[in-house]
Swiss-Prot record:
Protein name listed in UniProt: 5'-deoxynucleotidase plu3092
Keyword tags: Cytoplasm, Hydrolase, Metal-binding, Nucleotide-binding
Binding-site list for substrate: 16-17, 31, 67, 75-78, 135
Class of enzymatic activity (EC top level): hydrolase
Zinc-finger in keyword set: no
Enzyme Commission number: 3.1.3.89
GO function terms (MF aspect): 5'-deoxynucleotidase activity; metal ion binding; nucleotide binding
Length: 197
C-alpha cells in the first residue's frame, strides 16, 4: 500500500503566508495549480513569441509538483528561508530529503516515472527558471489580490516580489505582466465586461 497521494492530498491543509494576516487564506495545493497554469503560459509564450523550444506540458507538470515536499517540511516563510545563505543551503538539503522520502512512498515500479518530476536536480536550468518565475508571479498576484482587498499587510511583500521579478526578468514574463496581470486588480464585474456574449 502506498500513502503517496494521501500525503499529497494534505497539501491543501498547509497554508501559505502563515505569518501574514490574509483576507483570503491560500493553501499550497491551490498555489501549486496556479503556478502550473502560469508556468505553462510562460512556456507557451516563450515558444510562440520569443523563439523558445521548451516542453510546456512538462513544465506545467513539474510546476504542479514544485512544492510537493512541503507536505513533509511545511511551508517555511520566504524571509526565514532566505534570511542568509547558510539557512537557504540547509533548507535545500531538507527539501532534497523530503523529495526522496516522497519518492520512496511510491510503489517501486512507479518510482522511476516520478523521479524526473519530484527530484528537482533532474530538471533543466530552463525548466527551473520558468517555474521559479511562475512561483514568484503567483506570489505577486496574491499580493495584488490582498492589496486590492485593502490589506496593507502585503505592502512590503509586494515590494520584495517586484525586486524578485526584476531579477527573474524575461521577455515572456514581460508579456505575461502586460497582458494578464492587470486583470488581477479588477473586480469580477470589471473583468466580466469584456466577455463576449
Amino acid at each position: 500500500m502506498s500513502h503517496f497521494f494521501a500525503h499529497l492530498s494534505r497539501l491543501k491543509l498547509i497554508n501559505r503566508w502563515p505569518l501574514m494576516r490574509n483576507v483570503r487564506t491560500e493553501n499550497v495545493s491551490e498555489h501549486s495549480l496556479q503556478v502550473a497554469f502560469v508556468a505553462h503560459a510562460l512556456a507557451i509564450i516563450k515558444n510562440r513569441k520569443f523563439g523558445g523550444n521548451v516542453n510546456a506540458e512538462r513544465i506545467a507538470l513539474l510546476a504542479m509538483y514544485h512544492d510537493a515536499s512541503e507536505v513533509i517540511t511545511g511551508d517555511l516563510p520566504t524571509p526565514v528561508k532566505y534570511h542568509n545563505p547558510h539557512i537557504a543551503r540547509e533548507y535545500k538539503k531538507i527539501e532534497k530529503i523530503a523529495q526522496k522520502k516522497l519518492l520512496e512512498m511510491l510503489p517501486t515500479e512507479l518510482q522511476e516515472d516520478f523521479r524526473p518530476i519530484l527530484d528537482d536536480s533532474q530538471h533543466t536550468t530552463e525548466e527551473t527558471f520558468i517555474i521559479k518565475q511562475a512561483d514568484s508571479l503567483c506570489a505577486y498576484l496574491k499580493c495584488l489580490e490582498e492589496l486590492s482587498a485593502g490589506n496593507h499587510e502585503f505592502n512590503l511583500a509586494i515590494a520584495r516580489l517586484e525586486k524578485t521579478l526584476a531579477d527573474r526578468h524575461s521577455q515572456e514574463m514581460d508579456y505575461f505582466m502586460k497582458v494578464f496581470v492587470p486583470g488581477f486588480s479588477l473586480s469580477l464585474d470589471e473583468i466580466s465586461l469584456d466577455i463576449p456574449h
